[in-house]
């Protein structure tokens, strides 16, 4: 037939004819996905102490998919966001801190944490103890009572830079700079966003019951009672205890217990206890159980946490 010279009819079904093209596309698609994965920010974190800053924990981190469950800290949280956005639940609502802002959490205040943008967030944080902050406040402010932060988010690039300079000085072993910059940063934060924390003395019958329940859980951390048994022993009902406990501590008893177990595990790890032994001592079933909860609260696995503590001790 005219116009068919040099062409052979392709008797294959249409689906089979397309397959060579699809095979050609696959390597290109795999390469594209590989490039996209390489461009994604890598999660990393270092949680450590510097012996010349007693009473202060330090953290540098980049998180993308990390989600921090509701938890508390015994120390203050002063987190300086370098880029990205962190969203955290605090005081009954979600708040966000972006680049140039600080996320500020007072001791024993329940909060969460997660990425507010697809690329996550990168930040540096210092965790000074209440005693450290109180000493700085007594010397540099007119605050009376226990000092703390009023707002959980403060846009202040100058203090963000100070916090990162504290971390850099600690990494370089510059004790004079680290101590000086920390004091300047805390003083500035108290001036811009400082206030007096309310007393935590239990004033209502429900609060007193919650405090008694907390004491029982601390004492029986490894083998806690059921909610019903705990309520019966305290002379109340399970739901009444649940409401009172949540009102007093911002989370139900079982969530508070997990948080408390991680806190105690940190103390054991600081003292040199092996992670597997620490897990059982605080009531977790095994080390993987501790690993999961520890990373969701502290931000790093217990093994990495302990190695940094050991490095500090070995350097003395």
Question: What do the PLM-derived regions correspond to, one by one?
Answer:
Residues 310-316:
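C-terminal edge and immediately downstream basic/flexible tail or linker adjoining helix-turn-helix-like DNA-binding
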Residues 63, 194-201, 243-249:
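Short, Lys/Arg-enriched N-terminal segment that forms or immediately precedes the first helix
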Residues 112-116, 192-193, 246:
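Sigma70-family region 2
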Residues 2-14, 18-20, 46-145:
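N-terminal regulatory/effector-sensing and dimerization cores
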Residues 139-199:
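Amphipathic alpha-helical segments enriched in hydrophobic/aromatic residues interleaved with Lys/Arg
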Residues 152-164, 177-179, 196-234, 256-274:
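A short, Lys/Arg-enriched amphipathic alpha-helix from helix-turn-helix/homeodomain DNA-binding modules
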Residues 19-38:
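Long, intrinsically disordered low-complexity tandem-repeat segments
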Residues 215-218, 223-260, 279-308:
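Basic/polar phosphate-binding segments, predominantly the helix-turn-helix DNA-binding elements
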């Amino acid at each position: 037939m005219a116009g068919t010279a040099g062409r052979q009819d392709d008797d294959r079904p249409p689906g089979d004819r397309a397959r060579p093209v699809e095979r050609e596309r696959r390597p290109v698609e795999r390469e594209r996905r590989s490039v996209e994965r390489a461009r994604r920010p890598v999660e990393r974190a270092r949680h450590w102490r510097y012996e010349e800053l007693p009473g202060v924990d330090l953290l540098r981190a980049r998180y993308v998919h990390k989600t921090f469950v509701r938890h508390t800290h015994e120390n203050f949280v002063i987190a300086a966001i370098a880029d990205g956005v962190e969203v955290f639940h605090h005081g009954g609502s979600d708040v966000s801190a972006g680049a140039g802002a600080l996320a500020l959490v007072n001791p024993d205040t329940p909060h969460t944490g997660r990425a507010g943008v697809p690329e996550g967030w990168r930040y540096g944080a210092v965790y000074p103890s209440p005693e450290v902050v109180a000493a700085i406040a007594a010397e540099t402010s007119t605050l009376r009572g226990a000092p703390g932060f009023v707002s959980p988010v403060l846009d202040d690039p100058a203090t963000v830079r100070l916090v990162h300079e504290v971390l850099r000085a600690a990494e370089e072993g510059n004790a004079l700079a680290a101590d000086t910059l920390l004091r300047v940063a805390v003083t500035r934060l108290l001036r811009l966003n400082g206030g007096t924390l309310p007393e935590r003395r239990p004033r209502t019958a429900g609060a007193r019951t919650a405090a008694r329940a907390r004491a029982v859980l601390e004492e029986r951390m490894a083998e806690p009672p059921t909610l019903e048994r705990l309520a019966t022993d305290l002379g109340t009902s399970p739901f009444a205890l649940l409401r009172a406990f949540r009102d007093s501590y911002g989370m139900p008893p079982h969530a508070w217990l997990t948080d408390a177990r991680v806190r105690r595990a940190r103390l054991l790890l600081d003292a040199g206890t092996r992670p597997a032994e620490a897990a059982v001592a605080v009531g977790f079933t095994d080390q993987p159980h501790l690993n999961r909860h520890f990373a969701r609260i502290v931000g790093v696995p217990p093994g990495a946490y302990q190695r940094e503590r050991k490095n500090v001790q070995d350097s003395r």
